[in-house]
Structure formats: structure tokens, C-alpha cells
């Protein structure tokens, strides 16, 4: 006897909205109006410690649209959400997290399709899994992050001694993507995704780390599980959906040519992100008490991600533009430009010997 769990496009978008709402709650400092511990980094302009007055209206519109979209997933409500989210991300690029991008794409795919929605969503999830696995085929994941995940539990710590297992996990994740788009899918394969994401969630809970992505993992497992059920949506994605799938499935390749953002390239737990460190001979009061709690090198250096995660619950958005913004913002802490600088660390995903740093003086960041 075969057991199926069919679900409509309305049900799928409700899963996405629930996941998005939970992620936003776990990163409330990133979204709420008012003063910010970590500044906004807008697409245009400089870093700011306040969200601005009219942002309150945008935030209220977003919350209302999410609620209405969940209650009655009609296109007139769903269309607003990707637009509002992208505007809010433009006002602070830190909001453009991988999970934000994923939910924007899911909602936009549902809003632009009818019978083709299930097919398009399968291809979207396939892109995330395939790129998520492919980006992990590096020593930074197999030698470091995989070992860290294994060491969360004493009983599995020994597995981290075998980098080959890390590469195996990466390949398995890619296989999960392929299974979603095979012509003869088996409904029980959906349990593979539930198991995969459950292990990630359990590890994050045990490590007391990165809680904000737990709802994303839960939503992805639910979407994948239900998308293995038979449906009537066998139509090819329409032009709008094809464009969205192009962004999800092909643009991550452009990251390796410095033409696409790290956060939008499904670099999930790869440990290959660029890092910004601010150096100051004296504590910077713009960071509040985070400098005292998180600084190192005798209190002279602060990893900017530590500050962002402490205040917002997420890492900062990585780009030359945002690094310069945060550098200028922190340089205002000291009147002596010779006592402060921004240090950027870049890695080559496949060559650990190729790490290099770029140092900007505050004078250069002007």
C-alpha cells in the first residue's frame, strides 16, 4: 500500500512563510525598527545606527502581508512579499541571508505560477542541495567544519578524524538534489530529507549555535518531503519561474568569478567566507560591550562577524562594499587613524595555503 501526502501550492507557501517568520523572530534585532547595536549596511550610502522612520511603515506592511499570505495565499498578497523583502534587504544588506534569499525565491515561484509551481520548487530545492554539496567539496569543510559537527557529540567525535567522510556528506547532499528532479520519484525518499535536516537541527541545538537557521532546515525538509508526493503540476516552469531558477541554479557559479554574492551562492557551512577584523589600540565604543566580550589579541582586535552575530543573530553580509562601510563606521571610534585598521582575510576554497589578507587603513577607507 502506497501512502502519499499531497499538498497544494497554498500549503507549500504556508510552510515557507512559517519558516521565514520563525527565522525573523530568531534574528529580531535584524528586522525590528529603531536603534541598532550593529549598524545597517545599505546598498547605497553609509552604515547607520538607526533604521529610519519610514522603515516602520515597511516593517508593518511586511508583517501584515506575511499574515495575510499565510491566511489566504492569494497572489495579490504573495506578490508584495518578495518586493518588500528585497526593499528591506536593500536598506540593510545584512538581511540578505541565504535563508532570506531562499524564502524570497519560494514565495516568488508560488506567486508566478499555477500548475508549474511544484515542478519549479523541485528544481529550486535541487539547486540548493546540489550547490550546497558542491561548495562543501573543499578541505575547509571536510577537514574543519565536518570535524566540528562530529565533535558536538562525544560518541561521534572520532568520525571527524576522517575527512573522506566529510567529502561523502557533500556528495550525499548533491545526490539529494538530483533525487528531487528524477522522473520516477518514490514518495518514501522524502524521509531522507527529514532525516538529513533533523541531524543538522539536533547538532545545532546541541552546539547552542546558529539557532536562526533551524526553522529554515525544518521548512526545507517539509518542502522536500511533500514535493515527493504525486501532483498534477507537471507543466514546465513558466518564463518568470525559469528566471528565478536561473538566479538560484546558475548564478552561484558567478561567485567564483567575483560576480555574485557569497550569501546568494548556497555556501552552507563551507567555512570559506571572507572575514573582517577591526584593529584598534583602544576599545571602540560603537560596539557597546561586545568589544569587551569578544575582542582578542589583548583586546585590540574584533572579528566583525562576532559582533554581528551577538547583536543580530546572523553574520554580516560579505562584500567589498559592506566591508568598507563597516570599516568607515568603526574608524570613527578613534581620532587617530594610525591606531585603527580593517583587516580582511580571504581564502581559496581548494588551497588552504593560498589564504591572504588585505589591510585597509582608516585613511584608505574614507
Functional labels for PLM-detected ranges:
Residues 1-366:
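Alpha-helical membrane-anchoring segments
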Amino acid at each position: 500500500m502506497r501512502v502519499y501526502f499531497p499538498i497544494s501550492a497554498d500549503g507549500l507557501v504556508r510552510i515557507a512563510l512559517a519558516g521565514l517568520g520563525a527565522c525573523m523572530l530568531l534574528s529580531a534585532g535584524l528586522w525590528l525598527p529603531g536603534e541598532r547595536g550593529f549598524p545597517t549596511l545599505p546598498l547605497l550610502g553609509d552604515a547607520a545606527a538607526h533604521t529610519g522612520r519610514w522603515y516602520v511603515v515597511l516593517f508593518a506592511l511586511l508583517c501584515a502581508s506575511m499574515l495575510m499570505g499565510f491566511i489566504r495565499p492569494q497572489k495579490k498578497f504573495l506578490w508584495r512579499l518578495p518586493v518588500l523583502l528585497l526593499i528591506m534587504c536593500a536598506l540593510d544588506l545584512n538581511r540578505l541571508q541565504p535563508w532570506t534569499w531562499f524564502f524570497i525565491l519560494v514565495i516568488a515561484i508560488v506567486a508566478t505560477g499555477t500548475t508549474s509551481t511544484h515542478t519549479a520548487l523541485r528544481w529550486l530545492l535541487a539547486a540548493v542541495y546540489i550547490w550546497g554539496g558542491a561548495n562543501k567539496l573543499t578541505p575547509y569543510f571536510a577537514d574543519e567544519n565536518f570535524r566540528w559537527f562530529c565533535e558536538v557529540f562525544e560518541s561521534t567525535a572520532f568520525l571527524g578524524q576522517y575527512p573522506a567522510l566529510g567529502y561523502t556528506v557533500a556528495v550525499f547532499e548533491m545526490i539529494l538534489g538530483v533525487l528531487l528532479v528524477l522522473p520516477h520519484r518514490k514518495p518514501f525518499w522524502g524521509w531522507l530529507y527529514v532525516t538529513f535536516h533533523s541531524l543538522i537541527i539536533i547538532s545545532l541545538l546541541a552546539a547552542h549555535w546558529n539557532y536562526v537557521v533551524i526553522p529554515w532546515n525544518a521548512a526545507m525538509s517539509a518542502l522536500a518531503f511533500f514535493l515527493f508526493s504525486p501532483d498534477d503540476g507537471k507543466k514546465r516552469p513558466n518564463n518568470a519561474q525559469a528566471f528565478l531558477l536561473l538566479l538560484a541554479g546558475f548564478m552561484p557559479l558567478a561567485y567564483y568569478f567575483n560576480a555574485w554574492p557569497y550569501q546568494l551562492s548556497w555556501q552552507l557551512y563551507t567555512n570559506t567566507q571572507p572575514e573582517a577584523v577591526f584593529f584598534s589600540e583602544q576599545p571602540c565604543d560603537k560596539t557597546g560591550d561586545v568589544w569587551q566580550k569578544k575582542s582578542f589579541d589583548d583586546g585590540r582586535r574584533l572579528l566583525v562577524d562576532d559582533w554581528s552575530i551577538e547583536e543580530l543573530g546572523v553574520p554580516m553580509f560579505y562584500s567589498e562594499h559592506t566591508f568598507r562601510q563597516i570599516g568607515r563606521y568603526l574608524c570613527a571610534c578613534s581620532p587617530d587613524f594610525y591606531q585603527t585598521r580593517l583587516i580582511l582575510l580571504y581564502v581559496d576554497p581548494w588551497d588552504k595555503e593560498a589564504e591572504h589578507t588585505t589591510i585597509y587603513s582608516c585613511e584608505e577607507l574614507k
